[in-house]
From Swiss-Prot:
Gene: argD
PROSITE patterns associated with the record: AA_TRANSFER_CLASS_3
Species whose genome carries this gene: Rhizobium meliloti (strain 1021)
Keywords, sorted A to Z: Amino-acid biosynthesis, Aminotransferase, Arginine biosynthesis, Cytoplasm, Pyridoxal phosphate, Transferase
This protein's name: Acetylornithine aminotransferase
Lineage of producing organism: Bacteria, Pseudomonadati, Pseudomonadota, Alphaproteobacteria, Hyphomicrobiales
Pathway: Amino-acid biosynthesis; L-arginine biosynthesis; N(2)-acetyl-L-ornithine from L-glutamate: step 4/4
Length: 399
C-alpha cells in the first residue's frame, strides 16, 4: 500500500489539527474549542501562549538563537543557579528532552563509581511498568518488551523489580549495583504513585549500600503535584534527578540535576549536547520559573487539584460501571476505567476534552498548572457527560 504521508508511521495520531492555543484551550482549524487536559503530555505547564513565556522567547529571538557549548551562556548560569537554590542539587546539565536528561543521569551515576575505581558498578535497578524514554538505554531501563522488541539486544546493566516492593529491591542489590532509578509517580505505567514509605526506603537502601538514588521527575516535576518536585512529599533528597516537560512550558528543554558528589566524575569531555542549554530554551526556562516560583502559585495548584479530586471521586461513585479507580496526586491524575479505556477516551473527546492514554486501562488528566477551579469544574462536567454516554445512566451533575 502506498504511503499517504512522508512521515514515519510511529504515531497513532487523532484526526485533529490545532491552529492555536489560549490558556487551557486549543482551537482546531475549523474553530472548535477543546479543553486541553493533556497539556502536550504534561509539557504545557502554563498552558498555551502564556504571555510571560511568549515575551521571553520573542525577546531572546531578537538577540541570538544558538551558540553551542563552546562558549558561556548567561541564561544557563541563571537557570542552573535558580534550580540549585530550590532543590537538593549543586550541578546541572541541560538537555533538550526527558530521554536525554535520563541518559545524562545514568551516565552520571556510572561515572561516579568509575571515578572511585569501581568499574564493576554500572548496573541500575529500575521498576516494572516504568517509562524513561525511547533511546536504546532508556528503553532498556524501562524494561517494557513492547518498546525493546526489534531493536537488537537490550542494553546491559538494567534489571527491573516490582514497583513498590522494597524487599525485592534489597534482594536485587549486589556488588555490581550502581544506582536505583524510579519515577515517584509512574506516568506511562498508569499513574501509579510510590508511597512515601517506599521512597524513604529507597533512600535508606542507597545510603546503606553506597548507591545513588536517581529520580525521574520528567512528568511529575515542576509543580505538577503541588510541590515543586513530587519527591518532596516523601521528605527525601535524591542524588541525581532528571527533569523536562514542564520546565520548558512547551519549549524543548530538559535537565539533569545532581549533587556535587554525584557529579564528580563528569569532567570535561565525558558528556555533551550541541543544542542543550541553547539561549532560546534558557530564556523560556527562566520565564517558567518566574511563574512557578512566584508566591502562592503552588498553593493555587493544590487548591484546583482538590477540586479535581473531589469531582473525580464523585464521578467514580456515580459511575462504578465505568470508573474503577482514581489515581495520582496534584494535577497528575489517572482514571482507571472498567470499560475499555479507548471507549471512554472516544466519549471524552466527543465532549471536546483532551486527555492522555496510559497503561493499565488508565486515562491521564494532566491539565496546565494555571487551570482555574471554574475550568476544572467545566472539565469535570464534560467527563460526567462522557461517563454517562458510556454507562447509559443518568444522574445529578458532578461536583
Amino acid at each position: 500500500m502506498a504511503a499517504t504521508t512522508p512521515l514515519y508511521d510511529t504515531y497513532l495520531r487523532a484526526p485533529l489539527r490545532f491552529e492555536r492555543g489560549e490558556g487551557v484551550w486549543l482551537i482546531a482549524e475549523d474553530g472548535t474549542r477543546y479543553l486541553d487536559f493533556a497539556a502536550g503530555v504534561a509539557v504545557n505547564s502554563l498552558g498555551h501562549a502564556h504571555p510571560h513565556l511568549v515575551e521571553a522567547l520573542k525577546a531572546q529571538a531578537d538577540k541570538v538563537w544558538h551558540l553551542s557549548n563552546l562558549y558561556e551562556i548567561a541564561g544557563q548560569e541563571s537557570l542552573a543557579r535558580r534550580l540549585t537554590q530550590v532543590t537538593f542539587a549543586d550541578r546541572v546539565f541541560f538537555t533538550n528532552s526527558g530521554a536525554e536528561a535520563l541518559e545524562c543521569a545514568i551516565k552520571t551515576a556510572r561515572r561516579y563509581h568509575f571515578a572511585k575505581g569501581h568499574v564493576e558498578k554500572f548496573h541500575v535497578i529500575t521498576f516494572e511498568g516504568a517509562f524513561h524514554g525511547r533511546t536504546l538505554a532508556t528503553i532498556a531501563a524501562g524494561g517494557q518488551q513492547k518498546y525493546i522488541e526489534g531493536f537488537g539486544p537490550k542494553a546491559p546493566g538494567f534489571y527491573q523489580v516490582p514497583f513498590g516492593d522494597i524487599g525485592a529491591v534489597k534482594n536485587a542489590i549486589n556488588e555490581e549495583t550502581a544506582a536505583i532509578l524510579v519515577e515517584p509517580i509512574q506516568g506511562e505505567g498508569g499513574i501509579r504513585t510510590a508511597s512515601k514509605e517506599f521512597m524513604q526506603g529507597l533512600r535508606e537502601l542507597c545510603d546503606e549500600f553506597g548507591l545513588l538514588l536517581i529520580l525521574d521527575e520528567v512528568q511529575s516535576g515542576v509543580g505538577r503535584t503541588g510541590k515543586l518536585f513530587a519527591h518532596e512529599w516523601a521528605g527525601i533528597k535524591p542524588d541525581i534527578m532528571a527533569v523536562a516537560k514542564g520546565i520548558g512550558g512547551g519549549f524543548p528543554l530538559g535537565a539533569c540535576l545532581a549533587t556535587e558528589a554525584a557529579a564528580a566524575g563528569m569532567v570535561a569531555g565525558t558528556h555533551g549536547s550541541t543544542y542543550g542549554g541553547n539561549p532560546l530554551a534558557m530564556a523560556v526556562g527562566n520565564a517558567v520559573l518566574d511563574v512557578v516560583l512566584a508566591e502562592g502559585f503552588l498553593d493555587q495548584v493544590r487548591e484546583v487539584a482538590l477540586v479535581f479530586r473531589q469531582g473525580l471521586a464523585s464521578l467514580k461513585d456515580r459511575f462504578p460501571d465505568v470508573i474503577e479507580e482514581i489515581r495520582g496526586d496534584g494535577l497528575m491524575l489517572g482514571i482507571k476505567a472498567k470499560v475499555p479505556s479507548a471507549d471512554l477516551l472516544k466519549a471524552i473527546r466527543a465532549e471536546k476534552l483532551l486527555v492522555v492514554p496510559a497503561g493499565e486501562n488508565v486515562l491521564r488528566l494532566l491539565p496546565p498548572l494555571i487551570t482555574t477551579p471554574a475550568e476544572a469544574r467545566e472539565g469535570l462536567a464534560r467527563l460526567e457527560r462522557a461517563a454517562e454516554a458510556v454507562s447509559g445512566k443518568s444522574g445529578n451533575a458532578a461536583a
